[in-house]
Amino acid sequence: FEHTDRNIFKIVNQLEIVGQEKRIPDGIVYVNGLPVVVMEFKSAVKEDTTIMNAFTQLTVRYRRDIPNLFHYNAFVVISDGVNNKYGTLFTPYDFFYAWRKVESTDKSNDGIDSLLTMVEGLFRRERLLSVLKDFVFFPDNSKGEQKMVCRNPQFFATHLLYENILGHSHINIKGDGKGGTYFGATGCGKSMTMLFLTRMLMRSRHLASPTIVLITDRTDLDDQLAAQFVNAKLFVGDETIINVETRKELGELLRGRKSGGVFLTTIHKFSEDINLLSDRANIICISDEAHRSQTNISQNISITDKGVKRSYGFAKYLHDSLPNATYVGFTGTPID
């Protein structure tokens, strides 16, 4: 993966494959002899064939008749020349998506030019290797029937956040701990982006086995995120993925920890009496809905008949307890 030029990339058109039946996929992408992508194309001008026919041909006929072709498959592509989508062999049709950008700063591209956008944006050699390395997810309990591949916003966001975290981490002399904020609308797959980012961080040689703290501000969100992450230990690369239930447990897990671990908790567990949990620099705090939980670090003063009362938001206690951590925010609401 580190040396793109040491890999052999081939695309083969109309290769006859004999299994239960003889099938002829329109295109197969090979990396070092392994068939990692299978493509099926239909014509946009023929009324009797559609992109849905391409989907059925791949996920039903080819899967049934030439299953050996998919032993090393990462994802499949369906196209009618105008509509161009990709997904895994187990992805429902409604969740096949186009790759709409070549670079993260480009405008989304649909229509006739979108096939070229997919080729340049997804099949560039180093881009394809990156997807194969970090962006194809098998849940731990999938039993081979579940597999997910990133969408292009998740891919770009993960890489941008990863590079920003490395640049701003306190492992650097001039690091300020500002890992960045990701804005994504509801339904854009923020939790999967968090998962892809966590995998890249845990595998980073620069961060040397970091500890990841995932923070939400509601118990139901915490439970949802925990269910996903606890089922991704192989993907993340760490057996210690724990949904933290109490402040006491949070302290026991973080104090004295030298490396590793992914801990999910709510912001409310960080209170005035939490004190210092760790001064390590390779701790990454990732907050979901950060506009609600990470903007209240200033002091609030209220005057009552009992005198002046000073208080802070939970975010202040979080930063005090992990002073050298790098902080990353995910939100569906734009914040400054």
Region spans (language model):
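Hydrophobic positions in the central parallel beta-sheet of the AAA+
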Residues: 214, 262-265, 285
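ATP-dependent helicase/translocase motor core
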Residues: 1-211, 220-236, 258, 262, ...
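Signature of the SF2 helicase/ATPase Hel1-core->accessory helical subdomain module
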Residues: 51, 97, 272, 278-336
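Short acidic, S/G/P-rich loop/turn micro-motifs used as interaction or catalytic elements
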Residues: 44-46, 269-271, 293
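Conserved motor-coupling elements within RecA-like helicase/translocase cores
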Residues: 244-263, 276-280
